[in-house]
């Protein structure tokens, strides 16, 4: 059973980084405020046990990671620090260059963009390797890196160490070679089972956990000022959602009549329960019966997505989604049936007419008004669930004089270098509203 430890002490005004000597001699701490919880956690790493560290976002996990690396360096060992994405790895690399009292050439940023032939030579010379788990796991498998050469491995966002993710393989290598592993995360799991799985995957025998309620952490938690703005859907949106609800319930009733749905009304079926219907259908034996069930089930899922889009995101995302169904190269019989539904055709026509007259979801007006009132030269981030909504928001803001930019992931074909460029321009003030998923 791992040793679980959490501090409840009040902050000590006399704390200093010198408490961590001799390791603090390897870290530039002049511009870093010492915090009791960080010092306590760092001291816990000194014992050499593999450890899970849980700390809320924004409370200095990077400082802890750098000191963990410094411990290995002091003992004459090398260190690895990994992060799930290249941009995050780059941030850690820049932090290590800035904070560790090492020649920058001793710190290597190792990502997939580095050619495999060069990686082996570069990795053999580096005292600290910072990179992505996919690249390092590939190099471990190919023999370009030997885990036994390292004294410590730090995994940022270690909650990814589940299933077949590269973190899991790296953690297994640490266990096999007896290398200390330190996992950092703000979210170890939503239930006990997931937390236990993470602990086992990391091989952690010690847990250092802090929450925003701990006395030594609370003073550093920034308060949130949450304001909820309620808007009422327009007449046209209410009309279309009513139409979609009617179509969905027609199909859901067919599933209800054969015992696959607990109710014929989709608003009374939790989404999680609805998704479970698919598992029940897979276990059906009769092929004809099964085909009809699958047809109605997929019909419901496709139109529920359309319902979610128009009710929460607006007319444009709804129309855009229906158009994406229409332009698919290989349309299923379900999609053909949906598109030929006269009720849906009328709903799409009404939505297009409303868009032509300049109507959109009332949230757009509320968002624009809020930003124009609150910005005053400041920056803001706007989050939306769907990429089509991001495009709508950005266009609306730009059309009204707000300097906005969308930020989407690689599924949209955006390269990491382009993502980094957007973030850099946001930091430099080239635009002051970032709209992202």
Model-derived segments and spans:
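Conserved helix-turn-beta segment of the N-terminal RecA-like "Helicase ATP-binding" lobe
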Residues: 88-111, 199-203
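SF2 helicase catalytic motif II
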Residues: 133-194
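Walker A/P-loop
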Residues: 48-68
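Conserved helicase ATPase core of P-loop NTP-dependent helicases/translocases
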Residues: 114-122, 379-383, 389-396, 402-437
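Helicase motor interdomain insertion/brace
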Residues: 10, 166, 170, 207-218, ...
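Conserved Walker A/P-loop ATP-binding site and its immediately adjacent core
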Residues: 62-64, 77-98, 188-194, 385-390
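Conserved pre-motif I regulatory segment
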Residues: 10-54
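Motif I (Walker A/P-loop) of helicase-class P-loop NTPases
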Residues: 61-70, 165-169, 367
């Amino acid at each position: 059973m791992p040793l679980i430890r959490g501090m409840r002490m009040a902050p000590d005004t006399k704390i200093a980084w010198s408490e961590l000597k001799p390791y603090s001699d390897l870290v530039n701490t002049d511009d870093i405020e010492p915090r009791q919880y960080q010092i306590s956690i760092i001291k816990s790493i000194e014992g050499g046990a593999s450890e899970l560290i849980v700390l809320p976002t924004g409370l200095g996990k990077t400082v802890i990671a750098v000191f963990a690396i410094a411990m290995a360096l002091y003992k004459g060992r090398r260190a690895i620090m990994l992060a799930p994405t290249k941009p995050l790895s780059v941030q850690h690399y820049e932090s290590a260059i800035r904070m560790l009292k090492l020649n920058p050439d001793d710190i290597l940023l190792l990502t997939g963009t580095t050619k495999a032939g060069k990686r082996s030579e570069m990795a053999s010379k580096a005292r600290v390797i910072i990179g992505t788990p996919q690249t390092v796991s590939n190099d471990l498998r190919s023999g370009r890196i030997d885990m036994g050469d390292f004294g410590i491995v730090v995994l940022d966002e270690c909650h990814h160490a589940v299933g077949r993710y590269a973190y899991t393989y790296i953690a297994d290598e640490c266990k096999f070679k007896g290398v200390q592993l330190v996992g950092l995360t703000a979210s170890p799991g939503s239930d006990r089972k997931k937390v236990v799985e993470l602990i086992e995957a990391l091989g952690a025998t010690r847990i250092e956990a802090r929450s925003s309620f701990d006395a030594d952490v609370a003073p550093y938690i920034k308060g949130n000022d949450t304001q909820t703005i309620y808007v009422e859907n327009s007449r046209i949106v209410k009309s279309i959602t009513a139409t979609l609800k009617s179509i969905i319930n027609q199909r859901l009733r067919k599933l209800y009549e054969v015992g696959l749905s607990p109710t014929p009304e989709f608003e009374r079926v939790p989404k999680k329960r609805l998704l479970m219907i698919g598992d029940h259908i897979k276990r059906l034996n009769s092929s004809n019966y099964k085909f009809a069930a699958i047809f109605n089930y997929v019909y419901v899922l496709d139109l529920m997505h359309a319902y979610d889009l128009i009710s929460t995101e607006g007319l444009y995302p709804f129309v855009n989604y229906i158009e994406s169904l229409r332009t698919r190269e290989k349309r299923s019989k379900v999609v053909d049936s949906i598109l030929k539904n006269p009720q849906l055709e009328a709903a799409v026509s009404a939505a297009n007419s409303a868009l032509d007259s300049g109507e959109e979801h009332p949230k757009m007006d509320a968002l624009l008004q809020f930003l124009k009132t609150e910005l005053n030269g400041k920056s803001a981030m706007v989050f939306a669930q769907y990429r089509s909504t991001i495009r709508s928001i950005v266009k609306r803001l730009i059309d009204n004089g707000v300097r906005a930019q969308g930020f989407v992931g690689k599924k949209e074909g955006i390269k990491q270098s382009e993502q980094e460029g957007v973030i850099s321009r946001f930091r430099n003030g080239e635009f002051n509203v970032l709209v992202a998923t």
